[in-house]
Regions:
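N-terminal mature ectodomain segment of secretory-pathway/periplasmic proteins
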Residues: 1-56, 95-100
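Acidic/charged, solvent-exposed loop-and-adjacent secondary-structure segments enriched in E/D, K/R, S/T
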Residues: 48-81
Length: 223
């Protein structure tokens, strides 16, 4: 984890990404007393985020809890997750709209707009490699317009806030006949005047296990 804007800090550690059906777990532990962990779990119905300190959650956890569709739609983790919605788009009752092509890391990708069945404040875009159709990126965006103040002077002082979460997937290799990414990056940014924030997490995945039973309690991560 690296704080690129809005502070200073960097940490290394171990991480686990697990899924079973629509349930998803993202668990990371860092060698930092100030930020020792990030633990997010979706039990198929509710999203949980464990505080990294009493009463304190990270900006990423706060954003995801405010936008649970990231997990309930099976989007987080991409093809690393058994909940990935493109495995059963009709069952999810979601829609995809083609939005042209875009270059990512020098490669042409197909850009798709993802529209959940239930309304969401997020704009969600999925990117597939145009040559091999690997899922290489998902972007989530939300813009909050500046509120109107009680007076013109107060209105001028208000500022728009823009949130953006980018998942990037790379280093595709075969695991148990499946082609899966072995590097997973999360980048979360908040754009606001005089107080920007940019956080970066990179997961280097070294071991894959399949058909391993996981108890429901493991996905309830708020404690």
């Amino acid at each position: 984890m690296i704080i690129r804007t809005g502070g200073r800090g960097q940490g290394n550690g171990a991480a686990l990404i697990a899924s079973q059906g629509f349930r998803v777990l993202v668990n990371a532990e860092f060698d930092s007393a100030a930020y020792p962990l990030e633990k997010l779990g979706f039990d198929g119905k509710q999203l949980y985020a464990r505080p990294y300190a009493p009463g304190a959650r990270s900006p990423l956890a706060g954003f995801l809890l405010s936008h649970p569709a990231t997990f309930s739609e099976g989007l987080i983790g991409g093809t690393l997750s058994s909940a990935w919605p493109l495995l059963d788009l009709s069952g999810r009752r979601a829609k995809l709209e083609y939005s042209g092509t875009e270059k990512i890391a020098g490669r042409r990708t197909y850009k798709l707009k993802y529209i959940p069945h239930e309304s969401s404040d997020l704009k969600i875009k999925i990117f597939l490699d145009a040559e091999n159709f690997h899922h290489v990126r998902t972007e989530y965006e939300r813009n909050i317009a500046a509120p109107i103040g009680a007076t013109p002077a107060q209105s001028i002082s208000q500022r728009e806030i823009r949130y953006k979460l980018i998942e990037t997937f790379s280093d595709f290799r075969t695991e148990a006949s499946l082609t899966l990414p072995h590097t997973y990056n999360l980048q979360f940014s908040v754009f606001r005047l005089n107080d920007p924030l940019l956080l970066d997490w990179t997961f280097n995945l070294t071991r894959f296990t399949f058909d391993y039973p996981i108890e429901l309690k493991e996905f309830v991560t708020d404690r």
